[in-house]
C-alpha cells in the first residue's frame, strides 16, 4: 500500500468511533456465542483492530469478533472444556494464538489464494447453516430460558416445548430490540441500532427494573498480554485452528476483495493474512478468542468515511479506553444481545442464491445444500461440516471434469473429434472411447483430425493418451492431424506427442 494510503484522513476518526460504538455490544454478544465471558469479547475487540491496522492491506476491513468465528470457536472447545470456565477461556486464547500463527505463516509463504478453497457453494451452504444454528442458539435467551447442551436446534426445540421455563419479561425486550436494530437500518444505513437498543435497555432496567437474565459481573480493567496458555492442549487444537484459519479468512477475503474492486484499490491477500494473523495472535495473548473480518462493520466503516487503516486502529483504541467503564453494561438484559445476534446473522441466509444455483448449476446446488444440512446436523461441531463441504466441492469438480464433451463428425473420409474440457488422467479414456465409437460407425474412413481448441488444460496423462490414440490411429492406416492446439497446451503436447505443433 502506498504511503499516501496510511495518512490520516478526517473520516478515519469518525468511522473508527462509529464502528466502535457498534462493536462494543456486538463483542459482548459474540463472546457469549463463543462460550467465553462477555468481557473477553471486549478484550478481543480492543486488541484485534489495533494489531490488524499495522499490517492489513484493506483500508476498510473491520477486524474483531464475528458470528461465524465465534460459533466455530464454541464448536471446537465445548467438547473439551466447560464453556465460560477458566480452562475454557485459556483454551480460547490458545486457539486464537494458533490461528494467528497459521495465518501469518500462510501470508509469509504467499498462500493468500488458499482462501479460494472455500468455494462459493460451500460458503453459501455453510454461512446459511451457521446462521440457522446461531439463531437457534439464541432462542433460549430470547424467551428467558436456560438451554441444555448438544445440538442448538434440538435445545431450542426443547425450550419452545416448555413454556413454563420462559421468563415473560425477556420476550418483549428481545422483540423491541430486534425491531429497533432492524428498523434502524431502514431509517439510515449509519444508524447504530444496536447501540440505541443497548442504551434504551439499560435505561429501562434502571427506571423500571428487569427480572430476567442480565450480563452480570463483566469485570473491568485492561487486558494483560501473556503467553501463559495451556500449551499441553496444543496438539488437540491444531485441527480446529487450521479450519478456523482457513474458513475464517474466506469471509474477510471476500469482503476486502469486493471493496478493493469497488474503490479501485490494490488488495494483497497475503498481506491481509498477516494482518488477520497478527490480530488473532494479540487477541489470544490478551485473553481474547479467535477473530475475523466483519462484513457489516466494514460496510459501516466505509460508509462513515474511512479511508485508511487508521480507522481500524481508532476503533480498537476507543474500545480499549472504554474497558475501565464496562461495568455500566452489567445490567444489560441478555435478551437484547440475543436479539442483536439474530438480526445480524439473518442476512447470512441467502435464499435467492440457493435458487440461482438450483436453476443454473444443480451439482453446485447439491454441494451448497449438503453443506447447509451438515452444518445444521453436526452443530455445534460445524468445523466438520466445513471439511466435508470442501471435500464434496472437490469431488464435484472432479466429477464435472471427468467427462469430456466431444463433438464428433465425419467429413468425407476424415473423422473429426473436438474434445472440450480438461484432458487429464480421469477424462483421457473418454477421448479414446469417442474415437472407437466414431470408427465403429464409419469403418471406411481413413483420416482423423483432432481439434484441440476446446481444451482448457492438458496434463501428462492426457498428453500420453493423446499420443497413444494417434499412434493407434496411424497403425490402423489413418492420416492423423492436430489442429487448434491451445497456447497453454502447446508445450506439453510438443514434448509428449510425436507431432509438430
Describe each region flagged by the PLM.
Residues 499-501:
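Short acidic-hydrophobic, aromatic-tinged amphipathic segments that line or gate anion-handling sites
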Residues 347-496:
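The feature marks cytosolic C-terminal regulatory regions of anion transporters and related permeases
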Residues 1-396, 400-405:
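Transmembrane helical cores of multi-pass ion-transport proteins
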